[in-house]
Amino acid sequence: ITEIKADKTTAVANGKDAVTYTVKVMKDGKPLSGEEVTFTTTLGTLSKSTEKTNTNGYRKVSLTSANQGKSLVSASVTMPQLMLKLLEVEFFTQLTIDNGNVEIVGTGAKGKLPNVWLQYGQVNLKANGGNGKYTWYSANPAIASVDPSSGQVTLKDKGETTITVVSGDKQTAIYTIAMPNSIVSVNSSGRVDYNTANNICKNIKGSLPSSIKELKDLYDDWGAANKYQHYSQESITAWTLQTSENKVQGVASTYDLVRKNPLIDKVDIAGNYAYAVCVK
C-alpha cells in the first residue's frame, strides 16, 4: 500500500455523512490490479470490509457513524502481509441552534422570539453539536447584527434576516428571524411634550403606542429597557396616544420602559414629561 487518502478529517455523526478513503497498492513500482484489501475500523460502519483494487491499483471505501467520537481505519493486503493505519477522523453530532429558541437578555426567558421587538433589544442564540467552536454571521446586520463569538443578536430595524453559525468542523446551522408585527423605538434625544413626540413618530412612519397595555406587554416580553447596552437611562417615560376624553382634558397617559410606573389619564401634554417612543 503506497498511497492513503481521506477526503476529509471530520464528519457528522448522523449515519449518512461519509468519509471516503482511497488506497493504492503497487508492486515493483507498478499498480497491482485485483489485490484484495481488507479494511477495519474502531468506530462506525464501512461500506465494505474487503475490496479488490481496480486496474490502476486503487480501492475506495466509505465510513459513516451514528455515534460521535474518533475513528481509526486500517487497511491490509495479503501478499505480502502489510497493515497500515489510515488518517484518524472524528465524527461530531449535528450542529443545531437550540431548537429555534432564543434567550431574552433582559429577562433570561427562553422561547420563541417575540413578534413585537424592542429596538436594540438583544437575544442570545445557543449552538449545540459540532466540535464546540462556533463563529456567527448575520445575512443583514442592518436588521439584526450578531456577535461573531458569543451568538448574541441585537435587533436594529424592522425586517427579516438569517443568522448562520459555522462550527470548527465546517458544519452550518441557520436561525431565521421573521418579520415582526412591529418594532418599538425610543427617540433618546430627550423628553418632549406630547405633540412633539407624536410628530417625531409620524416622521418615521410610526405612531405613539396605542395604550399603556401595549407598553406593558413590551415590558413583559423584554424586561427593563436599560438591561440592554443601547439604553443607559434610569427612566424612559413614554407617551401613549390620547383617548377622546384625554383630548378634552389636555392630558395623556405615560408608561416607563425602565420602572413601569403607569400614569393614567393625568399627564399634562404641554410639558416635556416623556420620550417619543414610536411603534412602527
Curated annotation (Swiss-Prot):
Protein name: Intimin
Family annotation (SMART domains): BID_1, BID_2
Localization: Cell outer membrane
BIG2 domain span: 127-173
Task performed by this protein: An inverse autotransporter.
GO cellular component, one term: cell outer membrane
Domain Big-1: 1-92
SUPFAM superfamilies: C-type lectin-like, Invasin/intimin cell-adhesion fragments
Pfam families tied to this protein: Big_1, Big_2, Intimin_C
Disulfide bond residue pairs: C201-C278
Main location as per UniProt: membrane
InterPro entries noted in UniProt: Big_1_dom, Big_2, C-type_lectin-like/link_sf, CTDL_fold, Ig-like_fold, Intimin_C, Invasin/intimin_cell_adhesion
Family the UniProt entry places it in: Belongs to the intimin/invasin family.
Keywords, sorted A to Z: Cell outer membrane, Disulfide bond, Membrane, Virulence
